[in-house]
């Protein structure tokens, strides 16, 4: 028992401190504390000593063993801490770095136009109304003074639906937003029927419409905005002023030139196509319009001898194409994100 126990402890501490992984640490543990380890051999040799010496040396060996075990535990904890710190460093986030942009959606360009049109007309006192896309043949055609033999009523131009409404009238996908003229006016008249004179009707009705047509400038589903202003003293001059002001606001130009070209629509009399001047002396049709036909006024529940007004209908796709310089209507419906992202 001449071995220097303090030196054994120091050797164990140095051995444990020099290893960099748990496997090596276990090897060093076996060298000092294993079945054939230095301290284990010393404990086995105590049996050869006399009782008094065995007691003294046993206490010294156990004390040294405790110090070695403490060094072993400390090194294990140090290796575990180092491993955790390495993992944390590898997964660390630099909070000073700029964040990643979250991909945001945006309105479709046609819907942008929809909202822009509604905002412009809303600023001059027009209500915004919505109506059903499935209409009766009567509301879509008859109420708007379309004769029974009008070509628009044919299945080559209109999507008819199986079944009939509660009044046994044919059903179809509306071919224009004009039925909202009659629907909104009737609600307005019902609301104010207790008055001697019905207040002015000022409304636009943007929405989806359907026709059997498809090419670079036509789609079987497209968007229109209908406009209506009826009172007791509305003239064609009001129509020209309102629509010209709308175009100047929509295109953000004060030099816009507009002309009203005589035309024919069953629901207006007189009727006019509204054209807008573009470069090189060219004119492009923007809208159909006119003074509301007396028959239509009557179908609204109003007396055409007392009330008069104007109506117009414009394609939202066409307005969008002109504003952004797009020459193919089909681009709006192909869902190409590269195209749509330009208008975000």
From Swiss-Prot:
One Pfam family it belongs to: Phe_tRNA-synt_N
Quaternary data: Tetramer of two alpha and two beta subunits.
Protein's recorded name: Phenylalanine--tRNA ligase alpha subunit
Family the UniProt entry places it in: Belongs to the class-II aminoacyl-tRNA synthetase family. Phe-tRNA synthetase alpha subunit type 1 subfamily.
CDD domains assigned: PheRS_alpha_core (cd00496)
E.C. no: 6.1.1.20
Cofactor: record remark: Binds 2 magnesium ions per tetramer.
Main location: cytoplasm
GO biological process: phenylalanyl-tRNA aminoacylation
GO annotation, cellular component aspect: cytoplasm
Catalyzed reactions: tRNA(Phe) + L-phenylalanine + ATP = L-phenylalanyl-tRNA(Phe) + AMP + diphosphate + H(+)
Subcellular locations according to the entry: Cytoplasm
InterPro entries for this protein: aa-tRNA-synth_II, aa-tRNA-synth_II/BPL/LPL, Phe-tRNA-synth_IIc_asu, Phe-tRNA_ligase_II_N, Phe_tRNA_ligase_alpha1_bac, Phenylalanyl-tRNA_Synthase, tRNA-bd_arm
Residues involved in Mg(2+) binding: 269
UniProt keyword annotations, A-Z: Aminoacyl-tRNA synthetase, ATP-binding, Cytoplasm, Ligase, Magnesium, Metal-binding, Nucleotide-binding, Protein biosynthesis
Required co-factors: Mg(2+)
One of the record's GO molecular function terms: ATP binding
Native organism: Ralstonia pickettii (strain 12J)
